[in-house]
A protein has these predicted regions:
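Basic nucleic-acid-binding interfaces
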Residues: 1-23, 27-71
Length: 71
């Protein structure tokens, strides 16, 4: 898994059908109609840790392979 910037993760989730609902503090909150829970993506100037990216992918209901195709 490559190291990604927060903007890259948000863009990939948007391609997967997620919408930005709000930008609260240092996090972007994204929703998708068929998921009950929102996805929170940290918006820091540095790259996201691999564990954080994997957690976001898991919460979004995607596999790593599906997510990589969206990049």
């Amino acid at each position: 898994m490559p190291v990604l910037k927060p903007k890259e993760v948000v863009a990939a989730l948007e391609r997967a059908g997620f919408e930005i609902r709000r930008h609260t503090g240092s996090h972007v909150i994204m929703y998708k109609p068929d998921l009950r829970r929102p996805i929170s993506v940290p918006q820091h100037p540095r790259d996201l840790p691999k564990g954080t990216i994997r957690a976001i992918i898991r919460e979004a209901g995607l596999t790593v392979e599906e997510f990589m195709k969206l990049l």
